[in-house]
UniProtKB/Swiss-Prot annotation:
The gene is xpot. It is found in: Cytoplasm; Nucleus. Belongs to the exportin family. This is Exportin-T. Pfam families: Exportin-T, Xpo1. It comes from Danio rerio (Zebrafish). Keywords: Cytoplasm, Nucleus, RNA-binding, Transport, tRNA-binding. Its main location: cytoplasm. Coiled coil: none annotated. It comes from the Eukaryota. Mediates the nuclear export of aminoacylated tRNAs.
Length: 961
């Protein structure tokens, strides 16, 4: 072997040696007999270096995986001998190989087994077992090989081809017939021999039993001698977790429901008499987590058996199975309520399934009601935070608790389905008791009682949040709890989790305040003072900003008396935070968006006259405009790029805030009706100069463009005078992304104002198109994926724009561009339909072509256009689908073909027999037979276009064969 290349296998070797090792590896893989050197090295133990041994196994693995079929019988025999010789040397080694080498060897053994067991090496296991006996090094390789075989043949998480699946089924059938009893016997001997002396091997063997039990005869394992051995392992500290996992796999095996019930019951009996059900006496939480998983598996298996049996006529067996399920409930409850959340989480699924069983019963007996109540109390208790939860810096443990809480919420929702009255009553009881003495309780007690009230909102659903109408028992209880919540003073509790839960609950049940509006002032104060928007925690302030906006939106009709008071109290939260003051603002700019929207909602929905609304809106937006002007003056003079970015961000925020206030307007309350047009027009005039700012163009243009989108909706025609100048600036020195984002603005204007904007569109059409052509023609580096994607998106936007123009009543805009320009645009559409393998763009292009044929393809159409139809559009309808990139198995491409068919249909509608005549001359040039040509022409004359669509699909499928 190339010794110098082998030096490069060491992870600490120089890069040049590593490169050489890699090249050598590729060389040996490619060589027909290079692997034999590696086989010899392994068989004779030539190398002591671990990395070289691993390398040799990798080369061997490649041969078996990819070349096995082409090896001669002698070469295949050499592989078998190599593996067995290597295994023999392991038996004599004082120190076993490193685990990574043993794992790789096991993979190679498993691959050889998979390739040869059915044909060349049916005695694989007998040979291996005869060689290794009970030698610990040999047993280790044997067990690792079995796990590697499980991964290759059984593991359901690995995707196999149909051929591999067939092969794997044959292997399992062969093993069941020939060697499984011998393997099971070997496992028993290994477990018995090493249980006291070699815990690692014993655990490995238990893992093998667990892996294989799913597809072998269960009687080989579920018998007295094997189960007693497993149960004895449950009492050994180093083996008990692995034994638990093994029993879990046995219980999980698919089988007849009656047999499954018997198996689980006998197992439970033995576990119970061995004292395992005395959970409170067990201190090892890792074992208990495994035991909880086992009990969960047993419980779910029994529920599944009951579900199957309850559908049969045998009520006696079904009732027995239900009793078996119920007898596990006390143990389930002990595990569910355990202080360790992992132990509790592992039993949740059985608990959930048990509640599902109760939900299906016609009525609950006293014991079942008692069980429901016990589960309810357990869930309520386990929902509590513990002392260690870090609210300021949530890490992995906190994330796990949040997930666990979600599981408990599922249980609570299921409890509500089983017994809504019981849940409501229990929550009411806990809630009232807590609220009466919240001042003296720990935060987790207070938080969970409010949380339970919050969770009722989903557990007892009401359409559109109408929790306070309908069923009087429910509404009066909820109403009473809400009344207590907002009047008992708990919003003053000094813990962020309680504060947040208070506001979340107030907003979830915001419709309560429509029924009892007298509580609104108290809750408003909580939102506005140190409990809410002025809270010491940024996390609380941020969430409250969002919740406050939701609260105001729902209750805006009840806010009239408080509007100006609220606006004055939040005034400092509506200030644009200047980038240079260095002080952290109370709210982030994202939070401020909600505050501006809230202010807008208050002003717009107030009952004051339009004049007052205008005054308030001006008061809200004028400070933004002033700050904007000042910052915009500073920006071009700022030399430091970081400061430039900060200024541009600040300017963008100002525009975003102004834009967000406009969300308050509606069809009932338009900008005009509220007398606010002038204020927003002033904003427009203030913001538009940012478009000509020579620095930070991307950010500023994006912000102003978004504002224009909003103003087109809000100000309607009043915005039109500003569009030409704005467009001119946005088309200057632009990048692909600028254009791509600008086009929807023009499309929006076109679609909304139609003929009104025709003169403007005629003026801007070619400059816009030329800008697009120029950006698309810029050279980009071959591997620059971002640039390629941006160009693709721009191309799509361009075609969408042409589609908007063609589809609207502004189609004259194109017709008036002059023959040369029209031709240029038309060629880009043909190119888009045929040359770019982008079905989204192609589909749009065919829609455009179809529309243009409809507009200009008739007798009074555009001069020269019929000629264009025959020279370019009809050929495009055939050339595009014939491209190799046109994939007819792709749904998006099929839609493109559909539009292509509609284009042909439209041409025939407009040109009649002339079109058919052309096809009869054109199609033979594509090697289409006269019969098929005739057939296509007949289909084209059918009135139902579906026939044509289906025909075209078959036509191109045949053409591509």
């Amino acid at each position: 072997m190339d010794e110098q290349a082998l030096m490069g296998l060491n992870p600490n070797a120089d890069a040049c040696y590593r490169q050489r090792a890699l090249a050598y590896f590729e060389q040996l893989k490619a060589s027909l007999d290079g692997w034999e050197v590696c086989a010899e090295a392994l068989a004779k133990g030539v190398y002591s270096d671990d990395h070289v041994k691993f390398f040799c196994f990798q080369v061997l693995e490649h041969q078996i995986k990819f070349r096995h079929g082409s090896l001669s019988a002698a070469q295949q025999q050499l592989i078998r001998e190599t593996l067995m010789k290597w295994l023999q040397t392991q038996l004599m080694n004082v120190h076993p190989e490193k685990p990574f080498i043993r794992n790789k060897a096991a993979q190679v053994f498993a691959l050889t087994f998979v390739m040869e067991y059915l044909t060349l090496w049916p005695k694989f296991f007998f040979d291996v077992l005869a060689l290794v006996g009970l030698n610990p090094n040999g047993v280790d390789i044997y067990l690792r090989t079995l796990m590697a075989i499980d991964a290759e043949v059984v593991d359901r998480d690995i995707l196999h081809s149909p051929e591999e699946t067939r092969r794997n089924t044959l292997i399992k059938d062969g093993m069941r017939e020939q060697c499984i009893p011998a393997l099971v016997e070997s496992w028993f001997q290994i477990l018995q021999t090493y249980q006291h002396t070699h815990s690692e091997l014993t655990c490995q063997c238990l893992e093998v039993v667990g892996a294989f039990v799913s597809w072998i005869d269960l009687n080989l394992i579920a018998n007295d001698r094997f189960v007693n051995l497993l149960l004895s392992h449950m009492s050994m500290e180093e083996l008990r977790e692995a034994a638990c996992d093994c029993l879990f796999e046995i219980v999980n095996k698919g089988m007849d429901p009656v047999d499954k019930t018997k198996l689980v019951e006998s197992l439970c009996q033995v576990l119970q008499s061995a004292g395992f059900f005395n959970v409170e006496q067990e201190e090892d939480v890792d074992f208990l987590a495994k035991f909880s998983r086992l009990v969960n598996g047993m419980g779910q298996s029994l529920v599944l058996s009951w579900t199957k049996l309850s559908k049969t006529a045998d009520e006696k067996i079904s009732a027995e199975t239900l009793r078996a399920v119920e007898s596990k409930v006390p143990l389930m409850l002990q595990l569910l309520i355990h202080e360790d959340d992992d132990i509790s989480a592992n039993i949740v699924c059985f608990c959930y399934d048990y509640l599902h069983v109760l939900k299906q019963l016609p009525a609950l007996n006293e014991q079942q009601k008692s069980n429901v109540e016990a589960i309810m109390l357990a869930v309520m208790s386990k929902l509590k935070y513990d002392d260690e939860y870090n609210f300021e810096n949530e890490g992995e443990d906190e994330a796990m608790f949040v997930e666990y809480r979600k599981q408990l919420k599922m249980l609570l929702d299921r409890l509500a389905q089983v017994s809504p009255e019981l849940l409501l009553e229990a929550v009411h009881r806990v809630f009232n008791a807590t609220m009466q003495s919240w001042q003296t309780l720990q935060f987790m007690e207070v938080e969970v009682s409010i949380r339970l009230l919050y969770m009722l909102g989903e557990a007892l659903p009401a359409s559109h949040g109408a929790h306070f109408s309908g069923d009087s028992a429910k509404t009066s209880t909820l109403q009473a709890m809400m009344r207590t919540l907002v009047s008992c003073g708990v919003s003053e509790y000094q813990h962020s989790s309680v504060t947040l839960e208070f506001f979340e609950t107030v907003v979830r049940y915001d419709k309560f305040f429509l029924v009892e509006p007298q509580h609104i002032p108290a809750v408003l104060m909580a939102f506005l003072d140190h409990r809410g928007l002025r809270h010491s925690s940024p996390k609380v302030r941020s969430r409250v900003a969002y919740l406050f906006s939701r609260f105001i939106k729902t209750l805006h009709k009840h806010m009239n008396a408080f509007i100006e008071d609220i606006l004055s109290r939040i005034q400092d939260l509506l200030e644009l935070a200047p980038p240079e003051n260095g002080f952290p603002a109370l709210l982030s700019s994202d939070d401020q968006l909600f505050m501006f929207e809230t202010a807008g909602v208050l002003i717009v929905n107030g009952e004051s006259p339009a004049e007052r609304k205008q005054g308030l809106m001006r008061g809200l937006l004028s400070p933004l405009m002033e700050a904007f002007r000042m910052l915009l003056e500073k920006l071009p003079l700022e030399p430091d790029e970081e400061r430039q970015t900060a200024l541009a961000d600040c300017l963008s925020h100002a525009v975003g805030f102004a834009s967000r206030t406009s969300k308050a307007f509606s069809n009932k309350q338009t900008v005009k009706q509220c007398g606010c047009s002038e204020v927003y027009l002033d904003c427009l005039q203030t913001f538009l100069p940012a478009l000509s700012c020579p620095v930070q163009r991307g950010a500023l243009r994006s912000a102003v463009r978004s504002f224009l989108h909003r103003m087109i909706i809000c100000l309607e025609e009043e915005v039109l005078p500003f569009i030409p100048a704005a467009s001119q600036h946005m088309l200057k020195d632009c990048e692909a992304r600028d254009l791509q984002e600008f086009i929807p603005l023009i499309s929006q204007i076109t679609a909304k104002f139609k003929n009104q904007v025709s003169p403007f569109l005629q003026e801007i059409f070619m400059p816009l198109v030329m800008s697009i052509f120029e950006v698309l023609s810029r050279p980009a580096e071959e591997n620059d994926q971002t640039a390629a994607l941006e160009k693709q998106m721009l191309r799509r936007s361009y075609f969408s724009f042409i589609q908007t123009i063609a589809s609207s009543s502004s189609s004259q805009v194109m017709a008036s561009q002059g023959a040369e320009n029209i031709e240029r645009v038309l060629f880009t559409i043909i190119q888009g339909a045929v040359d770019f393998p982008d079905p989204v763009a192609q589909k749009t292009c065919f829609i455009i072509l179809s529309r243009l044929v409809e507009l200009w393809g008739g007798k009074d159409g555009l001069v020269g256009f019929p000629d264009f139809i025959y020279k370019h559009i009809i050929p495009a309808c055939f050339m595009a689908p014939l491209k190799t990139t046109f994939d007819l198995s792709d749904a998006q491409t099929v839609l493109t073909l559909s539009e292509c068919s509609l284009t042909l249909h439209m041409i025939h509608l407009k040109r009649g027999p002339e079109c058919l005549q052309f096809l009869q001359e054109y199609l033979p040039s594509l090697h289409v037979s006269p019969e098929i040509t005739q057939e296509l022409c007949q289909v084209l004359q059918q009135p139902d276009v579906k026939v044509l669509k289906n025909y075209m699909k078959v036509f191109f499928q045949q053409a591509k064969l």
